Regions:
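Preference for long, amphipathic alpha-helical scaffolds in soluble/luminal domains
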Residues: 2-166
Length: 166
């Protein structure tokens, strides 16, 4: 959300100034708690980095240090045991890297390219991909949510295939 505000809010507004302060707080939190355990929390910081870079905001944080720490963070949370990718709730590089021009692609090229091939190999005949997790404690909610998650996976996988067409 901070990145969105930095990108779209007018620079002379209070909300933009608040986003600048919150980005500093978030960065300090990241540094203090590095490395993070959560792939989702990690993805939020990668997204903040991308927004700031896209908007050429280089004066709020040490962007080079941020980039180096994020590179280590990404390597920390990606699941490299690819045998469980089809069956478990895991972290793939696409959570952080959505193009070959990403600052994080080259150091993760091999696993990104593997994911590309994995996506192609695991597509079902109907064009979808399976959801590899369940909400066992919430069967009624899962019956609905599984379709939503499957749609999300389809969209993300098609975008990944298009971007990483090897």
């Amino acid at each position: 959300l901070i990145g969105f505000i930095l990108k779209y809010a007018e620079k002379d507004t209070d909300i933009y100034k608040l986003a600048c302060e919150l980005s500093k707080e978030a960065y300090n939190y990241f540094k203090k708690n590095f490395p993070l355990e959560s792939m989702h929390e990690s993805a939020c910081f990668v997204e903040l980095y991308h927004y700031m870079k896209e908007c050429s905001i280089f004066n709020l944080l040490d962007m080079e240090e941020f980039k180096k720490m994020l590179q280590k963070q990404i390597k920390q949370v990606i699941t490299y045991d690819t045998k469980i990718w089809s069956t478990d709730y895991i972290c793939k590089p696409s959570l952080f890297i959505n193009s070959k021009s990403s600052d994080f692609y080259l150091e993760n090229k091999e696993i990104c390219d593997f994911e590309y091939q994995f996506i192609l190999k695991t597509q079902n005949e109907d064009g979808s991909w399976g959801v590899t997790w369940e909400w066992n404690d919430y069967p009624e909610e899962w019956a609905i949510s599984k379709n939503w998650w499957q749609s999300d996976i389809i969209i993300k996988n098609i975008k990944y295939i298009r971007e990483f067409n090897l």
